[in-house]
Amino acid sequence: MSRHSIKSFSSALFKKPFYVAFFNIIRFFEGPLEILIRYVFETGSYPAKFAVKTPLGLQKISVFSHDDLITLVECFGKQDYVAPEDVSLVVDFGSNIGISALYFLTRNPNVKAYLFEPVPRNVERLKENLKGFETRYEIKEWAIGIKEGRADFASEKTGRYGGLIKDGPSHLSQCPPERRIEVKIQSANKVLREILSKHDSVDILKIDVEGFEAEILAHLEMDVLGRIDRIYAEMTTDQKVPGFLSEHYGGVARYSRV
């Protein structure tokens, strides 16, 4: 049975992230009925292109699997990484095919985004989805961790659930050799310090690095944390971050500066 069966979807509508998603799919997406049917029943062929209304006008987004559609709904429907209208600087660890980046970049015409994504195929798709925004984002093909180096990275077929194999989730170690790539790892603190040498502060730090979110959060040093306003991390654990209040919204831990 579909993971988004009618029964599970109906019960989910009574939880805030999902009724927000339902409302925003109707409000912002062209062809909302098709989106809902694809999302609930996991039907339809891919790749596919969808259009969503944003503060900067209608944007077309290419998705390559049902998993990408889930990401699309998470970003523009559920608004997992909700950004204020006046957001100006975003750092995105784990940018995948650029859906979250497109959400951030379309909040207003002045947003600057620093993007990090180690999988070459994802980067190609990201650049396609972000056409027209090239002057407002920088992309580095790096994985983000707590120290610099190189390591094997599991790159599964959807591109959504890959991650560093060493010390990562156990299922990644089962990735066959043909789906492993060697990637460059950069320290989160070093990357953020370099960005903060050019800017006063980071409005939003988004972390979606398949199992290393908690480790990166614990590794961030106070001189860096003190210049970040919001953090969104794909994790369900109740991890504290000094100087921040936290809440859980679906599968995302949201941190806001005290």
Predicted regions and their residues:
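Phosphate/nucleotide-binding beta-alpha loop and adjacent structural elements of enzyme active sites
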Residues: 1-258
